[in-house]
Amino acid sequence: MIHGIGIDLIEIDRIKKAFEKQKDKLVKRILTQEEEQQFHSFKSEKRKLEFLSGRFATKEAFSKALGTGLGKTVAFKDINCYNDIKGKPCIDYNGFIVHVSITHTEHYAMSQVLLEKRD
C-alpha cells in the first residue's frame, strides 16, 4: 500500500553558494558518514555539487513522502541514500519499501521518492 509520494527540485547553484560558505559543515549536516565517503571520492567539484544537491533533494522528497518534512520526526542524517550494485539509489527505512529516483541537469537536481508500507 502506498504511504506517500514526495518530490523535490533544487538549484545546484543554491547548494554551491552554501557549500562555498560552509564547506565541510554543510556536507556533515546533510550527508551520512557513508554518503560523505562517496562525496569525497569524486574528483571534480561539479560532480561533488551534483551529488550533494541530489542527496539534499532526495532527503527532502523522502520527508515529504513520509508526511513529516524534515525536523522533529526525521533529520538529514536519519536518511542514508546509497547506490545498489547496479547504481540505483536506495534508502532503507524501517517498515517501508522505498523507491528513489534522482536526476540532474546543469542547473537543477531533482528527486522523487515513493514509500510503500510493508505488509
From Swiss-Prot:
Residues that coordinate or bind Mg(2+): 8, 60
Annotated catalysed reactions: apo-[ACP] + CoA = holo-[ACP] + adenosine 3',5'-bisphosphate + H(+)
Keyword Transmembrane: no
GO biological process: fatty acid biosynthetic process
DNA-binding in keyword set: no
Signal peptide positions (record): none
Protein name: Holo-[acyl-carrier-protein] synthase
Native source species: Staphylococcus haemolyticus (strain JCSC1435)
